[in-house]
């Protein structure tokens, strides 16, 4: 983040770097737990893994207070409109993390008539976390990958 440190004690950097640094340290996740992956998602916020170390302090219950949606579990056709509605209510900038084989592509229930074959057909997904169910470590790694993606993004449009 810091490109230049001068002798007088000044630090020079770009506006994008400062804003993206602040975004990575203040993710506000919202739980969208649909199946067994939700247990691992909640497990990651407990004392053993302490998701708060990575800037995701408290899981939000309201989409208007969240900027990260973690879709964990099997998404059925009846739940798909609700997922889209909740996503549309989230504040900008917003990110989606798809957790588990069922959320990524239907998983074990891929050929069922009532299962959406991946939540990326309903909302844009930024990070995919594989596994059935993925461990809490895998979810934390996915959040770290999302933070890397945020650091590479541009806040100010390039001319």
Swiss-Prot record:
[4Fe-4S] cluster binds at residues 36-37, 102, 132. Its EC number is 7.1.1.-. Transmembrane segments: none annotated. It is an enzyme of class 7 (translocase). It catalyses: a quinone + NADH + 5 H(+)(in) = a quinol + NAD(+) + 4 H(+)(out). It is found in: Cell inner membrane. It holds the Pfam family Oxidored_q6. InterPro entries: NADH_UbQ_OxRdtase-like_20kDa, NADH_UQ_OxRdtase_20Kd_su. Its main location: membrane. PROSITE patterns: COMPLEX1_20K. It is a peripheral membrane protein. GO terms for biological process: aerobic respiration; electron transport coupled proton transport. It comes from the Bacteria. One of its GO terms (cellular component) is respiratory chain complex I. Its cofactor is [4Fe-4S] cluster. GO terms for molecular function: 4 iron, 4 sulfur cluster binding; iron ion binding; NADH dehydrogenase (ubiquinone) activity; NADH:ubiquinone reductase (non-electrogenic) activity; quinone binding. SUPFAM superfamilies: HydA/Nqo6-like. HAMAP family: NDH1_NuoB. Belongs to the complex I 20 kDa subunit family. NDH-1 shuttles electrons from NADH, via FMN and iron-sulfur (Fe-S) centers, to quinones in the respiratory chain. Couples the redox reaction to proton translocation (for every two electrons transferred, four hydrogen ions are translocated across the cytoplasmic membrane), and thus conserves the redox energy in a proton gradient. NDH-1 is composed of 14 different subunits. Subunits NuoB, C, D, E, F, and G constitute the peripheral sector of the complex. This is NADH-quinone oxidoreductase subunit B. The gene is nuoB.
């Amino acid at each position: 983040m810091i490109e230049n440190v001068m002798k007088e004690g000044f630090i020079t950097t770009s506006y994008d770097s400062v804003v993206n640094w602040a975004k990575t340290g203040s993710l506000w996740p919202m739980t969208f737990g649909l199946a067994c992956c939700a247990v691992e998602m909640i497990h990651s916020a407990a004392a053993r893994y302490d998701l708060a170390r990575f800037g995701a302090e408290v899981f939000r219950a309201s989409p208007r207070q969240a900027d990260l949606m973690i879709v964990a579990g099997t998404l059925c056709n009846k739940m798909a409109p609700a997922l889209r509605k909740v996503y549309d209510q989230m504040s900008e900038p917003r990110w989606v993390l798809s957790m588990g084989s069922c959320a990524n592509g239907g998983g074990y229930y891929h050929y069922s008539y009532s299962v959406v074959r991946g939540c990326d057909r309903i909302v844009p997904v930024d990070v995919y976390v594989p596994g059935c169910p993925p461990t809490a470590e895998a979810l934390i790694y996915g959040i770290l990958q999302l933070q890397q993606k945020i650091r590479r993004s541009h806040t100010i449009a390039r001319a």
